[in-house]
């Protein structure tokens, strides 16, 4: 059965945003994701911009009541808590260094949270927020937007069904060339903060890019755990040091498999080098973000196959997220809508204390966010010690 916008939860969740304003690169992706299924979320408030007047003007143009366009998140949480129809969930679409304080304030105000990645600077902060969320009975979701591509669930099903055999090699890549020079930092505030350690944290592309692909690999292969890794990172544009614009990571998994991750913003000429290839003892499967509706399945000694999204031969877990049918292409907008719909289902289940749904729903939750921080921490630790093998802690 295809998703068609019908009600899946009892009523739309009253939703707000912190950040994601007129000048934001990512804010529109959040709104596309949340509002694609208009029975799941309703945008009712926001602190959209560090410039309060610009944020208010933007919010009004989105259809938000002027009185609920707030100058900052502190005021929003305080004022919304006084209302009978106050917000129930907030999305945090701000620079990395602000995530922790906003997330903590939201939970203390009794509001569910959906947050940009990387979640926080340290895994210790992640554990603290996880404990607070559990105490308050709230959900924290993380917007690993690419993970909403349903062909990734097809990969997961094929691996679980033994269709590629034992996993031997994991080949991960997320690269582009848009930061091959420092011109972006000169004209874009969003790019400038990404290479500022005080705002971005301990990494650039490891946090900004590779966390997406790392989570996707976990989604596809939930039983695969990294035993140790080695990270070599570079700042080819020197002004970005100590943050990296290129990194290679080697991985040893607990089952004996090996893996690689190449993440880069200086892959000159590359528009979208985002791919995952899993090599098994029987066959290999591969997915490219530039062709999100297709999955390559190659059995040793047989002609290669291209599996296409929306077709009845795919697993039910994949087709459960189908929206447009195989005749039409789906892409990033649908992927974001898929994860936002799962956030809504998780929040609704949490509100109703429906543990069965929560235990069976696959979505990027706070544990996924903490695991992404651990990935960054271990990569940076290896690189800073001279690119040595380190235990994955």
UniProtKB/Swiss-Prot annotation:
Task: Give yes or no: UniProt keyword Secreted.
Answer: no
SUPFAM superfamilies for this protein: Glyceraldehyde-3-phosphate dehydrogenase-like, C-terminal domain, NAD(P)-binding Rossmann-fold domains
- Give the EC number(s) under which this enzyme is classified: 1.-.-.-
Example GO molecular function: oxidoreductase activity
Query: Which stretches are annotated as coiled coil?
Result: none
Keyword annotations from UniProtKB, A to Z: Oxidoreductase
Q: Which InterPro entries match?
A: Gfo/Idh/MocA-like_OxRdtase_C (IPR004104), Gfo/Idh/MocA-like_OxRdtase_N (IPR000683), Gfo/Idh/MocA_oxidoreduct (IPR051317), NAD(P)-bd_dom_sf (IPR036291)
Q: Which residues form the signal peptide?
A: none
Question: What PANTHER family does this protein's entry cite?
Answer: CONSERVED EXPRESSED OXIDOREDUCTASE (EUROFUNG), OXIDOREDUCTASE
The similarity annotation says: Belongs to the Gfo/Idh/MocA family.
Q: Write the protein's name.
A: Uncharacterized oxidoreductase YfiI
């Amino acid at each position: 059965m295809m998703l068609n916008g019908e009600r899946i939860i009892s009523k739309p969740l009253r939703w707000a945003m912190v950040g994601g304003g007129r000048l934001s690169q990512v804010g529109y992706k959040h709104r596309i994701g949340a509002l694609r299924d208009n029975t799941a979320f309703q945008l009712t408030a926001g602190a959209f911009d560090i410039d309060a007047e610009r944020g208010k003007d933007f919010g009004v143009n989105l259809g938000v009541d002027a009185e609920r366009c707030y100058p900052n998140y502190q005021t929003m949480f305080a004022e919304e808590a006084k209302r009978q129809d106050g917000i129930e969930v907030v999305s945090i679409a701000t620079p990395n260094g602000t995530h922790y304080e906003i997330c903590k304030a939201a939970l203390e105000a009794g509001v569910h949270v959906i947050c940009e990645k990387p979640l926080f600077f340290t895994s210790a902060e992640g554990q603290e927020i996880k404990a607070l969320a559990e105490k308050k009975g709230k959900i924290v979701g993380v917007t690993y937007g690419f993970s909403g591509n349903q062909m990734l669930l097809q990969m997961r099903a094929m691996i679980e069904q033994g269709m590629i055999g034992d996993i031997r090699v994991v080949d991960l890549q997320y690269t582009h060339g848009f930061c091959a020079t420092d011109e972006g930092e000169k004209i874009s505030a969003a790019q400038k903060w990404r290479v500022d350690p005080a705002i971005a944290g301990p990494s650039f592309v490891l946090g900004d890019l590779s966390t997406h692909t790392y989570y996707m690999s976990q989604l596809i292969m939930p039983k695969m755990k990294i035993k140790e890794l080695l990270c070599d990172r570079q700042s080819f544009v020197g002004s970005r040091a100590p943050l990296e614009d290129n990194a290679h990571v080697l991985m040893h998994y607990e089952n004996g498999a090996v893996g690689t991750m190449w993440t880069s913003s200086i892959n000159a000429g590359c528009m979208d080098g985002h791919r995952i290839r899993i090599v098994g003892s029987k066959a290999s499967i591969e997915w490219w973000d530039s062709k999100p509706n297709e999955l390559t399945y190659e059995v040793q000694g047989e002609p290669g196959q291209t599996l296409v999204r929306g077709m009845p031969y795919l697993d039910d877990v994949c087709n459960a997220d189908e929206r447009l049918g195989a005749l039409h292409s789906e892409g990033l907008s649908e992927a974001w809508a898929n994860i936002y719909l799962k956030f809504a289902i998780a929040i609704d289940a949490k509100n109703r204390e429906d543990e069965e749904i929560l235990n069976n729903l696959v979505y990027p939750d706070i544990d996924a966010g903490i695991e992404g921080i651990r990935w960054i921490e271990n990569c940076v630790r290896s690189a800073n010690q001279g690119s040595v093998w380190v235990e994955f802690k």
